[in-house]
């Protein structure tokens, strides 16, 4: 095939194209002079389609004669040619091919003009496709002729374009044509090529109008031409990215071909279509693989995948929340850095939205889209159905209080979503729409919405919300909406009645913060828009469990906890069962809360977003030593969990243990490290890296200090001992020396042997 115009080699490409065009013109002109002009025009980007059709019509006639035999040979030798075509393609792949690669890659757009012309003439596919397309449109006889001319056109154009012996290339083309994907791909590189491709299915269908074998041959020829080794590889590289476009175009053209076929009344149109369709199916598969995009066909699969993602997200969220709770010292910083860790991590909080028409049907909608999560941040009222109002509400929303978006009767429709303000209502509606879309797609997969609602709400939304709350500060009792908590998937009426303001949804505005803020002693502060960190507390449905937790954790907040029960004064039996099911899900939450220090006297500074008195207290650097206490508490909780105690027993035991630990914490050393430098508490605490790192750092610092003290004391003792030893030895030596001296001095010598004074000698 002729070299594709390279932006750098436009001139050379044009020359090559001109030569290829001339050759193709010669052949086509022998048949009819028109093709040459179409080729020239085809070189023009804008004129390509029409001129291609002209060229194809003329070339088709010329090629008909040349390719009639070739097409038949191709039909017979298509398998063998198939293998041949590929070797040939490497052969033809020589400079032109590489040029084609480079030029196509660099100047894929450049193909549009000269390249497309040459590709059209050379990849007969486009030219044949367009030619067949236009020729079929123009001349029915040309269609039949096109089939053969395509083969001949492939030869002539292949010769002219490739300027390489392309007769072997023709078999290669035939072989290539066997894979229509390639032909589409080869033709696709340039936008015009894509146009040609769009027409290619049409052409294929026109060729389908011809006898099946003939049409298929033509298609094969076309594909072979287009997939001529140079074009094939060059185009394949450029076209793989555009394979999707090719698929699209092929599909589009696929639809046109029926029209052409029907208009042409081709005998083999249906068969040709079928042949084209199978060829295109692989294309679609290729598109999926290359683009990593999900086809509409896999919508159901996507739905199921989404549901799975939701469950996984919840599990991850729970792990994160536990890790945070285990390392309370890190919690304040963690909250500051990651106000909504789940949202940041892309863990989408599930909001189960029950759309009830009247108090009857309740569609369960799971919305886990990031947009929804963001909206949930803005609209705390949008709750993951049961207890959790996933995101923190805007301060204004909190101030306004959470009012059920719908009246108690309408509250049943969306008990989950209570919009604090008109803005929230808008976001709520958006969430509903998105959730409804997802729900509609998901519901087919799952069981009836009621069943999904009960299970999903109980299992998924609960963990997500509760752990989200924990992560963001369980006790940041921003205006928690007991309404949502009270709402149960089963009884929406009970939910509406149970809504924090049991008497009326409107009363909830003022009430929820106080009742749901057992931990926070200052209800008014809670009413104030808490910092975005504030996560709505445990669902009102779980208020009983929350009360128990708070009693265990914050005995001082018991008075307020009394308020909490008000949230669910008349839990419906459905909600009770849901609470029972949820208790198990909340057990990790209880463990986490228990692990947190049970100091009711938390520093709940009104401004601090993390109104977790105990958390803030323990998190304060002054109480870094409390980490060990937390670890011990965690170990107690973990041991209780392992023992398999029922939630109530576990709570009791944990509460007692935590109290004992608090009493003993002063006497107990922070952490007892074994030979390996780890303790069972650390192992069993399921600490996240941050908390574990903090504990290890504290421990190491402590050890270093102790070691330094020991070293100092030992060094002081050794110095003293050394000094004493040296002094004593010196004294002893001096004494001995003095004795000898005295003896010598006292020793009477003869006068002749009198020696100078020993002092002079010694000195």
Swiss-Prot record:
InterPro entries: GPRIN2-like/GPRIN3, GRIN_C. One of its GO terms (cellular component) is synapse. One of its GO terms (biological process) is cell morphogenesis involved in neuron differentiation. The modification Phosphoserine is found at residues 323, 359. Residues 27-44, 237-250, 437-450 have a biased composition (Polar residues). It comes from the Eukaryota. Keywords: Phosphoprotein. Residues 1-48, 65-111, 192-268, 420-452, 471-624, 711-737 are annotated as: Disordered. Residues 93-104, 480-496, 518-539 have a biased composition (Basic and acidic residues). Residues 593-609 have a biased composition (Low complexity). PANTHER family: G PROTEIN-REGULATED INDUCER OF NEURITE OUTGROWTH 3, G PROTEIN-REGULATED INDUCER OF NEURITE OUTGROWTH C-TERMINAL DOMAIN-CONTAINING PROTEIN. May be involved in neurite outgrowth. This is G protein-regulated inducer of neurite outgrowth 3. It comes from Mus musculus.
């Amino acid at each position: 095939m002729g070299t594709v115009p390279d932006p750098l080699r436009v001139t050379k490409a044009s020359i090559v194209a001109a030569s290829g065009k001339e050759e193709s013109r010669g052949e086509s002109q022998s048949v009819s002079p028109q093709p040459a002009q179409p080729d020239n025009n085809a070189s023009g980007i804008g004129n390509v389609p029409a001129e291609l059709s002209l060229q194809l019509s003329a070339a088709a006639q010329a090629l008909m004669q040349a390719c009639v035999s070739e097409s038949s040979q191709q039909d017979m030798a298509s398998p063998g040619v198939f293998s041949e075509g590929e070797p040939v393609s490497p052969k033809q792949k020589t400079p032109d091919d590489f040029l084609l690669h480079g030029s196509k890659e660099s100047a894929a757009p450049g193909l549009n003009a000269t390249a497309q012309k040459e590709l059209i003439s050379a990849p007969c596919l486009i030219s044949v496709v367009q030619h067949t397309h236009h020729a079929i449109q123009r001349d029915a006889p040309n269609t039949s002729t096109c089939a053969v001319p395509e083969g001949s056109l492939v030869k002539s154009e292949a010769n002219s374009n490739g300027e390489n012996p392309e007769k072997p290339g023709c078999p290669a083309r035939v072989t290539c044509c066997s894979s229509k994907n390639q032909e589409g791909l080869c033709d696709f590189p340039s936008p015009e090529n894509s146009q040609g491709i769009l027409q290619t299915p049409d052409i294929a269908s026109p060729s389908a109008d011809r006898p099946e074998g003939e049409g298929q041959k033509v298609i094969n020829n076309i594909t072979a031409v287009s997939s001529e080794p140079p074009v094939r590889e060059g185009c394949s590289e450029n076209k793989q990215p555009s394979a999707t476009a090719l698929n699209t175009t092929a599909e589009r053209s696929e639809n046109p071909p029926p029209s052409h076929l029907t208009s042409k009344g081709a005998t083999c149109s249906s068969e040709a279509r079928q042949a084209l369709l199978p060829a295109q199916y692989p294309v679609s598969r290729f598109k999926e693989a290359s683009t990593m995009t999900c086809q509409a066909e896999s919508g159901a699969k996507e739905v199921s995948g989404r549901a799975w993602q939701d469950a996984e997200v919840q599990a991850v969220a729970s792990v994160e929340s536990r890790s945070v709770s285990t390392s309370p010292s890190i919690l304040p910083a963690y909250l500051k850095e990651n106000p909504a860790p789940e949202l940041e991590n892309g863990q989408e909080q599930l909001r189960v939205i029950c759309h009830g028409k009247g108090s009857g049907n309740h569609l369960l909608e799971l919305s886990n889209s990031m947009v929804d999560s963001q909206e949930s941040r803005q609209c705390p009222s949008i709750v993951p159905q049961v207890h959790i109002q996933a995101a923190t509400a805007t301060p204004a929303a909190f101030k306004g209080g959470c009012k059920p978006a719908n009246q108690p009767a309408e509250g049943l429709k969306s008990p989950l979503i209570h919009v604090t303000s008109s803005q929230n209502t808008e976001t709520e509606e958006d969430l509903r729409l998105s959730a409804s879309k997802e729900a509609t797609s998901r519901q087919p997969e799952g069981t009836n919405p009621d069943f999904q609602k009960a299970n999903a709400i109980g299992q998924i939304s609960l963990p997500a919300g509760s752990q989200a709350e924990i992560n963001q500060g369980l006790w940041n009792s921003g205006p928690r909406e007991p309404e949502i908590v009270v709402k149960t998937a089963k009884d929406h009426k009970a939910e509406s009645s149970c809504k924090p303001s049991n008497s009326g949804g409107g009363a909830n505005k003022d009430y929820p913060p106080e009742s749901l803020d057992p931990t926070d002693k200052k209800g008014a502060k809670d009413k104030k828009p808490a910092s975005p960190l504030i996560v709505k507390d445990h669902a009102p449905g779980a208020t009983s469990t929350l009360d128990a937790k708070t009693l265990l954790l914050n005995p001082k907040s018991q008075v307020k906890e009394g308020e909490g029960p008000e949230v669910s004064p008349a839990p419906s039996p459905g909600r009770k069962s849901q609470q029972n099911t949820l208790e198990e899900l909340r057990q990790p939450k209880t463990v986490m809360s228990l692990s947190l220090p049970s100091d009711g006297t938390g520093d709940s500074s009104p401004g601090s977003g993390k109104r977790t008195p105990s958390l803030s207290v323990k998190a304060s650097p002054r109480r870094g030593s409390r980490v060990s206490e937390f670890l011990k508490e965690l170990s107690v909780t973990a041991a209780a969990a392992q023992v398999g105690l029922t939630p109530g027993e576990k709570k009791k035991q944990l509460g007692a243990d935590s109290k004992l630990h608090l009493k003993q914490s002063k006497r107990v050393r922070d952490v007892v490290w074994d030979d390996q430098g780890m303790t069972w508490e650390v192992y069993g605490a399921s600490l996240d890296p941050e908390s574990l790192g903090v504990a290890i750092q504290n421990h190491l610092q402590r050890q270093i200090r102790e070691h330094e003290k020991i070293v100092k004391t030992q060094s002081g003792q050794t110095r003293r001992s050394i000094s004493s030893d040296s002094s004593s030895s010196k004294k002893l030596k001096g004494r001995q020396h003095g004795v000898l001296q005295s003896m010598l001095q006292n020793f009477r010598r003869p006068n002749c042997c009198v020696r100078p004074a020993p002092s002079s000698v010694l000195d």
